[in-house]
């Protein structure tokens, strides 16, 4: 029976769907869709960063690179939020959640990259205490990313965070199974196929 039952979770660019497949045929009445995909996550990150740091509204490609480099799905959202709040006071806490993303510099032929957050360096640059810093460091444009790293992909699981009246992925799965015979639930849950680019986000599979 399990080989006849397949539950496909597809989280791609435009949306996320849950589709039960029985003997090779999708069960149409049980398909569930969430209008959250990679595009929305990138746009949401872009909006947050533009409000808090640099204006990145027109930099969709760069912000997609940032998302793929730094974002993760939290398996303990409350704890990660608390660690982020403490980051300004305790360096060891900051290093566990907060990271720097050095924006690409096309003039110097440098691509963007993530590195551990250095609060002392950030404070120096913010205060204009630039003596002793290399020309390379001075020329860098850096995004400091803390709770953005996990609040953005959290929309896949809690879309109500941005006011969407739709179920997140776990509830979608339950809703999908609810219209199927109870005797088949275990068979579908024993054979889950997860596809789509968002499934590559660190922590996605563990959370699911």
Q: Regions from the language model: what does each represent?
A:
Residues 1-208:
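C-terminal region/appendage detector
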């Amino acid at each position: 029976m399990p080989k006849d039952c397949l539950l496909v979770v597809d989280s791609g660019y435009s949306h996320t769907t849950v589709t039960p497949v029985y003997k090779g045929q999708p069960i149409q009445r049980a398909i569930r869709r969430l209008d959250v995909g990679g595009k929305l996550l990138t746009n949401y990150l872009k909006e947050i960063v533009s409000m808090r740091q640099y204006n990145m509204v027109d930099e969709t490609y760069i912000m997609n690179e940032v998302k793929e480099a730094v974002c993760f799905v939290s398996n303990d959202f409350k704890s990660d939020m608390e660690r982020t709040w403490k980051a300004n006071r305790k360096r060891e806490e900051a290093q566990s959640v907060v990271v720097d993303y050095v924006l690409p510099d096309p003039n110097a032929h440098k691509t963007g990259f993530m590195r551990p957050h250095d609060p002392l360096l950030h404070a120096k640059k913010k205060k204009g205490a630039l003596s002793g810093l290399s020309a390379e460091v001075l020329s860098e444009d850096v995004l400091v990313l803390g709770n953005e790293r996990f609040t953005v992909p959290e929309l896949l699981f809690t879309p109500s965070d941005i006011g969407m009246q739709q179920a997140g992925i776990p509830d979608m799965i339950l809703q999908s199974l609810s219209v199927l015979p109870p005797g088949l639930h275990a068979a579908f849950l024993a054979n889950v196929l997860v596809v789509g680019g968002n499934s590559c986000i660190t922590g996605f599979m563990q959370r699911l």
